Curated annotation (Swiss-Prot):
Residues 187-416 form the Sigma-54 factor interaction domain. GO terms for biological process: phosphorelay signal transduction system. Keywords: ATP-binding, DNA-binding, Nucleotide-binding, Phosphoprotein, Transcription, Transcription regulation. This is Anaerobic nitric oxide reductase transcription regulator NorR. The keyword DNA-binding applies. It comes from the Bacteria. The modification 4-aspartylphosphate is found at residue 57. InterPro entries: AAA+_ATPase (IPR003593), GAF (IPR003018), GAF-like_dom_sf (IPR029016), Homeodomain-like_sf (IPR009057), NorR (IPR023944), P-loop_NTPase (IPR027417), Sigma_54_int (IPR002078), Sigma_54_int_dom_ATP-bd_1 (IPR025662). ATP binds at residues 215-222, 278-287. Required for the expression of anaerobic nitric oxide (NO) reductase, acts as a transcriptional activator for at least the norVW operon. Activation also requires sigma-54. Residues 479-498 bind DNA. One of its GO terms (molecular function) is DNA-binding transcription factor activity.
Length: 504
């Protein structure tokens, strides 16, 4: 089989139609999957030694949230280094990053795999991956035909990257024209609320306005602050962080503004405060609503006049600091209650941002779950960590009162539990590995630190013993019934139990 002119024209047309780059990329991937008759296709962007999925077809939705590092995925590293079409043999020992991620075929391994690196000049900017479940699925397509596909995709991706950078430079006039991508903090999410937030971040980052970031606990307000700073003209200067809720009143003023030697007992030398450290940069004040009224007055003066006084010093110091503040409180209500100064509130909230709670972000839950699964896979040295369809449905049906932080902890705990239930480094997370109850949500966060402080092998074995013992008790001490409950082969269960000291 070879590509006809009509097929190539169709691919080119798909790259010119659609609203926005994302739509065009999705049309490209869907068309390629149909034309090449493959089981899965993906367009990936290369950034900071990792591949970031931009569009997928035939793969689980959580793939869009995963970040595939070169170190963790040898096939993708091979594609990145190749410079040309890569065909992996059906019996390749290199694990495929999409094994277990093709819906309806979770238990099957990917057999046929082609990688097309995408270049802008000599620079790698991305890759196309084509996967099939039959070993000879792509044998009828020549390398020359695949290079034509790669050339079309490279042009489309490069144009999108150039437009993205030009738009950013138009917002910030005077920036040097340089088309070299710099990795920034990434906010994962494609829901309308998150897309709107990203747009607002892009707008306000280019200015020097103070920003008040509101949102529930665990939504990612610090990540928003980092994104604003990194996209701002101040990005080359420091971003200094201060948690106002953790400041004892006795040292709060010194932490903010510094002190001179002898200002108080224990002040044995001059010390710069956070404002001085952030000079020409950005100061992020987390939990701003916890500051006392006295400190609020002094903070207001800095915002008004741009000068500070160290504790114990009569001299003023000029500082040039952009302030980003975050709170999980309703500061308007705090103003009405007399707990927060109205003038400070108006100074801080020149451009307010609101981070949506996870329960309002729809499918973003699955993307974030994929991101955390990939993190766990790398940290624990596993070959793969995938979510079963039931697990995805379970995550989508939960309300997430603890937001993204709770999801992260829940995924980490589920990975440990899922690994304990089976042999090997292939981990499949099922709904039963989650204990998601609104009233019990804090318990997830409380349990994880204890696990993290233990030796990983010992913690895993302890979970395995606990689960096997419980399953035996619930199944009348029948090893066969226990194996069925744990979804294990009974012979493997006997071997595992013997290794764990549960059998003689």
């Amino acid at each position: 089989m070879s590509f006809s002119v009509e097929v190539l024209a169709r691919i080119a047309i798909e790259l010119q139609t659609g609203i926005g780059h994302q739509d065009r990329f999705q049309r490209l991937i869907s068309t390629l999957r149909h034309v090449l008759d493959c089981d899965a296709s993906a367009l990936l962007r290369y950034e900071g030694r990792q591949f970031i999925p931009l569009a997928i077809d035939g793969l689980a939705h959580d793939v869009l949230g995963r970040r595939f590092t070169l170190e963790g995925h040898p096939r993708l590293e091979t594609i990145a280094r190749a410079g040309d079409v890569v065909r992996f043999p059906a019996d390749s020992d290199l694990p495929d990053p999409y094994d277990g991620l093709i819906p309806g075929q979770e238990s099957l391994k990917v057999h046929a795999c082609i990688g097309l690196p995408l270049f802008a000049g000599q620079n790698l900017i991305g890759a196309l991956t084509l996967d099939g479940l039959e070993p000879d699925q792509f044998d009828t397509f020549s390398d020359e035909e695949l290079r034509l596909i790669a050339a079309l995709a490279s042009g489309a991706l490069n144009n999108a990257l150039l437009i993205e950078q030009l738009e950013s430079q138009n917002i910030m006039p005077g920036s040097p024209v340089a088309f070299e991508h710099v990795a920034h903090t990434e906010m994962i999410g494609l829901s309308p609320g998150m897309m709107q937030l990203k747009k607002e971040i892009e707008i306000v980052a280019a200015s020097d306005l103070n920003v008040l970031i509101g949102g529930e606990t665990g939504t990612g307000k610090e990540l928003v602050a980092k994104s604003i700073h990194e996209a701002s003209p101040r990005a080359v200067n420091p971003l200094v962080y201060l948690n106002c809720a953790a400041l004892p009143e006795s040292v709060a003023e010194s932490e903010l503004f510094g002190h001179v030697k002898g200002a108080f007992t224990g002040a044995i030398s001059n010390r710069s405060g956070k404002f001085e450290m952030a000079d020409n940069g950005t100061l992020f004040l987390d939990e701003i609503g916890e500051l006392s009224l006295a400190l609020q007055a002094k903070l207001l003066r800095v915002l008004q006049y741009g000068d500070i006084q160290r504790v114990g010093d009569d001299r003023s110091l000029r500082v040039d600091v952009r302030v980003l503040a975050a709170t999980n409180r309703d500061l308007r209500e705090e103003v009405l209650a007399g707990n927060f100064r109205a003038d400070l509130f108006h100074r801080l909230s020149v451009f307010p941002l609101s981070v949506p709670p996870l329960r309002e972000r729809g499918e973003d839950v699955v993307l974030l779950a994929g991101f955390f699964c990939e993190q766990c896979r790398l940290k624990m040295g596993l070959s793969r960590v995938v979510l079963s369809p039931g697990a995805r449905s379970h995550l989508l049906s939960y309300g997430w009162p603890g937001n993204v932080r709770e999801l992260e902890h829940a995924i980490h705990r589920a990975v440990v539990l899922a690994r304990a239930a089976r042999l090997g480094d292939d981990v499949v997370i099922h709904a039963r590995h989650f204990a998601l109850h609104d009233e019990a949500a804090p318990a997830v966060a409380q349990e994880l630190p204890a696990i993290a402080n233990e030796n990983l092998r010992e913690a895993t074995e302890a979970f395995q013993r606990q689960m096997i013992t419980r399953a035996l008790d619930q199944n009348g001490r029948s090893w066969a019934a226990c194996a069925r409950a744990l979804e294990m082969d009974v012979a493997n269960l006997h071997r595992l139990a013997k290794r764990l000291g549960l059998k003689g």
